[in-house]
């Protein structure tokens, strides 16, 4: 490859997604990619872009940053320290976040899979950078795989 210089910089985007809190430039970059590419929110029909629009009235946002493995589900367990990792968040509409509550992912995913059907369920996974079958994964394995999928957006 003539004229092309290479650099030994580490690939750091997946590592940046390992930090706590769904905020900052890396999280905002992920959201921006979702806005531009147009996927639907997790298990929903509205797009991320639609839910991020400023509300015409009222004080409640149309979307929530949902803990995929709910915070209270992880609280007090061996992964309590990692419950707010960026890779553990997805945009959901406000009502779905209330419905999911603090349920084990195995419980709430089964409900949405039955309601959506297999094709829409798989699409929702892909559009939200979720490893297929995450609800059956060890939490740390889920975080590792999701960081890689998110960094591809």
Report the location of each language-model feature.
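C-terminal, well-folded lobe of enzymatic/effector domains
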Residues: 6, 117-153
């Amino acid at each position: 490859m003539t004229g092309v210089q290479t650099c030994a910089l580490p690939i750091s985007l997946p590592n940046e997604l390992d930090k706590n809190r769904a905020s900052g430039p890396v999280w905002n970059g992920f959201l921006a990619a979702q806005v531009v590419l147009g996927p639907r929110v997790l298990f929903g029909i509205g797009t991320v872009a639609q839910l991020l629009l400023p509300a015409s009235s009222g004080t409640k946002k149309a979307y929530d940053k949902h803990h995929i493995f709910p915070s209270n589900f992880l609280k007090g367990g061996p992964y309590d320290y990692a419950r707010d990792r960026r890779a553990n968040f997805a945009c959901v509409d406000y009502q779905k976040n209330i419905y999911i509550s603090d349920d084990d992912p195995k419980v709430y995913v089964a409900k949405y899979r039955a309601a959506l059907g297999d094709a829409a369920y798989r699409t929702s996974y892909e559009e939200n950078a979720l490893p297929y079958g995450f609800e059956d994964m060890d939490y740390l394995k889920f975080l590792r795989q999701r960081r890689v999928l998110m960094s591809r957006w």
